């Protein structure tokens, strides 16, 4: 079915399913539409603002941030950014804080920091996709929308990190997708 990944202030994975979902863990919320389809949804507290914060720390423009992130190797030479900057709801960790781990003198560079921020955010969205999949929803492709979709680094890295083809429609307001 259709699955969207929306990266705004928060991150949202929303799918369409023929069957209702009943997630005892509470990570996936089940909604329904007027036509009888079911709409499983997983939502994070931390979306594109994770990248805004990383960009601010680096003191660079959006384009410079993207160039830095895309210039670093996959995995950011072992630098890992856990993007729980405002706690988190998927997984349910309201008191969690962000982390930057795996730092060495060799890998603590602006490029690796930018790459780790993008990869960390996308891994968080991947966890949301996995939570929806665990409810029996097939996800073969995602549509990437929201302010985060404007970042070249997000568009470029999404397919490899999320593990599915990613479609990015023309910029617009897609709150109903």
Region spans (language model):
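Active-site core segments that coordinate phosphate-bearing ligands/cofactors
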Residues: 1-177
């Amino acid at each position: 079915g259709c699955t969207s990944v929306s990266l705004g202030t928060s991150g949202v994975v929303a799918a369409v399913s023929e069957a209702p979902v009943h997630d005892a863990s509470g990570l996936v919320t089940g909604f329904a539409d007027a036509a009888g389809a079911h709409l499983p949804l997983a939502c994070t507290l931390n979306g594109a603002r994770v990248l805004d914060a990383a960009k601010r720390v680096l003191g660079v423009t959006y384009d410079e941030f993207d160039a830095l992130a895309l210039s670093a190797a996959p995995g950011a030479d072992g630098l890992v950014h856990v993007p729980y900057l405002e706690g988190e709801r998927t997984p349910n960790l309201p008191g969690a804080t962000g982390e930057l781990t795996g730092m060495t003198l060799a890998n603590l560079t602006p490029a690796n920091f930018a790459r780790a921020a993008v990869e960390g955010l996308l891994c968080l969205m991947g966890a949301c996709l996995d939570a929806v999949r665990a409810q029996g929803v097939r996800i073969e492709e995602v549509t990437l929308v929201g302010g985060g979709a404007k970042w070249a680094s997000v568009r470029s890295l999404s397919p490899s990190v999320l593990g599915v083809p990613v479609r990015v429609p023309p910029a617009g307001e897609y709150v109903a997708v």
